[in-house]
Amino acid sequence: MAAASAVPVLNAAVDPVPGDVRIGVASYSFREFSRSLCIKGTKALNTPYLCIKEFHALYRSTPQELDKAKADFQKAGLTLTGGGTVYMLKDDMADIKTYFEYAKRLGMPMMNIGATAKSLPMIEKTLKDYDIQIAVHNHGPEDKHFPAPSDALKLMKDMDPRMGVCIDVGHTTRTGKNVLEEIQAAGPRLLDMHIKDLSDLMNRDSQVDVGDGQMPVVAIFKQLKKMNYKGIVHLEYEINADNPLPGMQKSFAYMRGVNAALRA
């Protein structure tokens, strides 16, 4: 990755100021690159928090290969905050367990998942054997199961508290829902967040660097602080796939600026 190799890699990530919203990377942003370059790019962004997509640790890996992946992240000083989106769409307990075993082997505390109304109870049951949080990731109008976070939340009201949502703010706004209201409604079931910015909040193809679009990032961070949100806001940078780092650096700089402004 040319951009990553051109940026000095710091030896230690920036320690967040207490009270700041913690920001990290969704490795889908580095989907065109190897695990080693994903690690290098994440370190260049000066954050320890990484939520990995399968590109960087394959589901079909052997236990030894997953151990190697885990060691690679640990040696780099990165914290695996979760993985996904992991699709658990089958009404099949054995299939669901394969993903929990994958997450357990990598030491993931959480999985962001795609699910169905039928598979959710099976996932909840399996969770109790693994103590891994489950965050349903919404995917907007094209998602026939859970377009908005509230679509998943209404099925979770009596479920284990380790069942929650990963709110993708871009997909949420495209449903026409108020993203701030969706965040507030999630409350303690908000386990994770994927952030992006759009120049047109209804158009998935209008993604821009965070801070350059219409996403109410400042208001989102204010709401997260008000809720005492303990999770991570992961940048999911879906544009400029062949050279994502410059735009990711700009996005991180903007979000760090928002954090700084909200400390007063």
Locate the predicted segments by residue:
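Glycine-rich, positively charged N-terminal anion/phosphate-binding segment
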Residues: 60-72
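Residues that line or immediately flank small-molecule/substrate-binding pockets and catalytic motifs
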Residues: 54, 85-87, 115, 190, ...
